[in-house]
């Protein structure tokens, strides 16, 4: 018998698919037929590490009858979004709330924020001016670049205190030049993720028959994890005192340690994906839970991709740029857990504008960082059947999904 909310597992439901702008009042109105324990205090939104709402929330209810009433609201609408309702329990709720959000047990803020949408050529001085009146620590601005040295349009800023970082969030959607800038909570852990390992967005082309021998040696050096050399300084300008600057690419494309002095050889195993045919190897995300997209419209944006996967909430989106500086029609999308990446595969062959999108899973349960137990998976509505996609058991996926698609023609990003 389930105990009351003052002890035991309580009377808890989980909502999924909430609008990003959802408020406590919206949840109370949606569950107006139910008694919410402690009123507004009984609604607990789940946040991403960037401080954004994840589209999910736990709600503590007053009785088992209230839980049954709430479950009847499954698939009903809130605005233009339909909401999924799952039965949950206090153990799951406490675990998820503890391990989500920028203030979670898995991350430390230390006064960091992340900026997105910076104009091309944005300088650190412009960022300082953007946050005029808020003290930024010395060398506290990081402008990540990709292995080709191109600005990603994002930045990390460390303020002198967490209070100042909270004030900095008030600059969300203000402008630098003609671009409106998004400001999110961040953490030192997230800063590290952009350079730990620094090869996360690197693509290595298989050498052609007329390539110089050095090119082949570089390729073999990575695949065999042999001949690793220290990275040379260059592209990753962290801006934090004591952190060395790395490009992430040595003359031999080899890696020994990251900028925190840790061995990088681990990240080379199980991270090469043969699914795109024989012409390319792609290094996957540091979370280990990535979905590759192919066939994107030429003008597709990050927001289009976030909306495509709604109500799931990707951790990060990287739209690939070719050597000619144009989009390739492909993108890598990182998710926080293996379960979310598997759930995202339900969007395979769905349309974005007038193009259908192919998806390829690159995630393993073994790469999950602590993640959800089977009980948590059930709370998310992920069944064992869903964990098996297109006849391939998720546990058998070894950094390589979609081998059955390798014979298909590549869907480019050009219309």
Swiss-Prot record:
Changing residue 150 to A: No effect on affinity for RNA oligonucleotide. The modification Phosphothreonine is found at residue 215. The modification Phosphoserine is found at residues 104, 107, 161, 187, 193, 195, 265. Residues 81-86, 179-184, 355-360 are annotated as: Interaction with RNA. Identified in the spliceosome C complex. Interacts with AGO1, AGO2, TBP and TXNL4/DIM1. PANTHER family: HETEROGENEOUS NUCLEAR RIBONUCLEOPROTEIN-RELATED. This is Heterogeneous nuclear ribonucleoprotein F. It comes from Homo sapiens. The gene is HNRNPF.
């Amino acid at each position: 018998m389930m105990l009351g909310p003052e002890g035991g597992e309580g009377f808890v439901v989980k909502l999924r698919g909430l609008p990003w702008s959802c408020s406590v009042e919206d949840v109370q109105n949606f569950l107006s037929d139910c008694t919410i324990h402690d009123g507004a205090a009984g609604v607990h939104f789940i946040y991403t590490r960037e401080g954004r709402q994840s589209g999910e929330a736990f709600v503590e209810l007053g009785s088992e009858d209230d839980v049954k009433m709430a479950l009847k609201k499954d698939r009903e609408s809130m605005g233009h979004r339909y909401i999924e309702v799952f039965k949950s329990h206090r153990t799951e709720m406490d675990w998820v709330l503890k391990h989500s959000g920028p203030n979670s047990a898995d991350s430390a803020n230390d006064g960091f924020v992340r900026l997105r949408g910076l104009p091309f050529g944005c300088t650190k001085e412009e960022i300082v001016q953007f946050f005029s009146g808020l003290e930024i620590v010395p060398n506290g601005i990081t402008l990540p670049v990709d292995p080709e040295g191109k600005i990603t349009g994002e930045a990390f800023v460390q303020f002198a205190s967490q209070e100042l970082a909270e004030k900095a969030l008030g600059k969300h959607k203000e402008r630098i030049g003609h671009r409106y800038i998004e400001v999110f909570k961040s953490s030192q852990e997230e800063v590290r993720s952009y350079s730990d390992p620094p090869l996360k967005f690197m693509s290595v082309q298989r050498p052609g028959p007329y390539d110089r021998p050095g090119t082949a040696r570089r390729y073999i050096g990575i695949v065999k994890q042999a001949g690793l050399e220290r990275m040379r300084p260059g592209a990753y300008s962290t801006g934090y005192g004591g952190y060395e600057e790395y490009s992430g690419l040595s003359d031999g494309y080899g890696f020994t340690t990251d900028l925190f002095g840790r061995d990088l050889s681990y990240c080379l195993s199980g991270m090469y994906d043969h699914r795109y045919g024989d012409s390319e190897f792609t290094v996957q995300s540091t979370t280990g839970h990535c979905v590759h997209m192919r066939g994107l419209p030429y003008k597709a944006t990050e927001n289009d991709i976030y909306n495509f996967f709604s109500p799931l909430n990707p951790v990060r989106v990287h739209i690939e740029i070719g050597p000619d500086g144009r989009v390739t029609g492909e993108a890598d999308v990182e998710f926080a857990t293996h379960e979310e990446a598997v759930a995202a595969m339900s969007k395979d062959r769905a349309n974005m504008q007038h193009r259908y999108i192919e998806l390829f899973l690159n995630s393993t349960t073994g790469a999950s960082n602590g993640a959800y137990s089977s009980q948590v998976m059930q709370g998310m509505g992920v069944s064992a059947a869903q964990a098996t996609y297109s006849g391939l058991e998720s546990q058998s996926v070894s950094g390589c999904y979609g081998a059955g698609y390798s014979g298909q023609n590549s869907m480019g990003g050009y219309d």
